[in-house]
Amino acid sequence: VLAAVAVTTAFTATAEAATPGQVTAGSGWKLISPDSVTSLSPGTYTIQFDSTAARTKLTPYLKLSAANTAKLTPGVKFVVSTTLQKRVTTGCQKARTIVASLEYRPLGKKGYSQGGACYSLADHSLWSGYVRIDTEWFYPKWFSTNASTNTYRIRNSTTHEFGHAIGLGHPNKDLNHDGKVADYECPLNKDKSRPLMCSPNGGMVTSAGAGNYTPLDIPGLKALVANYQYR
């Protein structure tokens, strides 16, 4: 039996335990929910594409996302395939696949994209996932009038959605204690950057850092691996 969960992203801690031993949140990171994906099962997850357009446009970005994720998840690999696979719109994708689509305003709102995941009800490990990327991200100067910055932001944004597809959530928190959890309200890294998974966006806007998880994100990925032993 499977269950699905989705996280929507716009681009314009005390730890919790899901089951004994599992950690689902910490300073600057959290999983989507302690009741959804709590671990990654060892082996390979394959990234496929919903269309030739998605494959052409998203392959270089998702290769970066996959590589940057895999180096932080020992025993769990993410491989980008050339295979075309229609995204399942009701229910879950095939086991151990993450399907990427390129759509104009997939949620009907300017700049909104989405990442989502399915998990096994038996042990809450990741079953499959998807990313739906807004074509507007690739319009000239969409994120910035600076071409390099624009590219860096696309890298960060794609990895952000990929993070949702494997179980990472937004780590936003009411830091100023005003009773509201606001956009960009996330703990900061030592270099003052926001976690990559911060909503609506975060990450390092540099040539070397773009598309990478920040130091605050990394414990979340490590938790997804470590939690599997406590399933």
Tell where the protein language model's regions lie, with residue ranges.
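Bacterial N-terminal signal peptides
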Residues: 1-10
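A short alpha-helix/helix-coil micro-patch that ends at or immediately precedes a cysteine
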Residues: 47-86
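Catalytic zinc-binding patch centered on the HExxH motif and its immediate surroundings
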Residues: 90-132, 182-184
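Short pre-active-site segment immediately N-terminal to the catalytic Zn-binding motif
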Residues: 136-158
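Short, low-complexity, Pro/Ser/Thr/Gly-rich segments in the mature regions of secreted, periplasmic
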Residues: 212-231
